[in-house]
Amino acid sequence: MLSSAELIETTADRLSAYHAGHIVADPVLAASSGKKLIRDDAIDYLKNRLFPIAELITPNIPEAQLLSGISVRSKKDRIRCAQWLYETYGCAVLCKGGHDKETADDLLYADGAYRWFPGKRIEQPNTHGTGCTLSSAIAANLAKGFDLPSSIERAKDYTTHAIAFGLNLGAGSGPLHHAFDLNSRFAANARQEHNNITLN
């Protein structure tokens, strides 16, 4: 998480120096609790240094409104907001819908066009780190060679399951269960090994 202008500038410099590809920037401006996570002067550095070298930025609705100055009250507003961000910063924009009360649909604006990615809303208190998980999963899939739409689809599927299997750790909002699929694969492998032993 880049909370200061100095951190953002250093990160942007290093990414440019190493010619990094598939940069996904999640502008973490505030926590779901409302707590501010970035200094005011750092927002300009996000806009001017990090966004222009990113392949994709992934603001949620409140962040998209803050970055664009456009009020989002409908899907049409969200399209207009994402288009403004795309045209202003020259990168693809995934406007996340987790803060929408009715749906969890995400909006991608890229290459001059938009596309909706339907999402399933899950009633789960343990959602700490959802946005970071989604953006990291998108970056991982881009690094594997998947195109942007496929990377988003795969990342949304992974994140949805990680939310569904969220970990209940003490009080407050717990984290997602990032290893949910790893555990299931281990279980499947163990069953297969057991069956092989039984058959032999």
Predicted regions and their residues:
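Short pre-catalytic strand/loop immediately N-terminal to key active-site residues, enriched for Gly-Thr
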Residues: 114-128
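Glycine-rich beta-alpha junction loops
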Residues: 29-31, 97-101, 121-123, 156-159
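Short, charged, surface-exposed loops that flank catalytic or proteolytic processing sites
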Residues: 71-78, 143-153
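Conserved phosphate/ATP/ADP-binding segment of small-molecule kinases
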Residues: 40-114
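Residue-level signal for inorganic ion chemistry
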Residues: 26, 60, 96, 131, ...
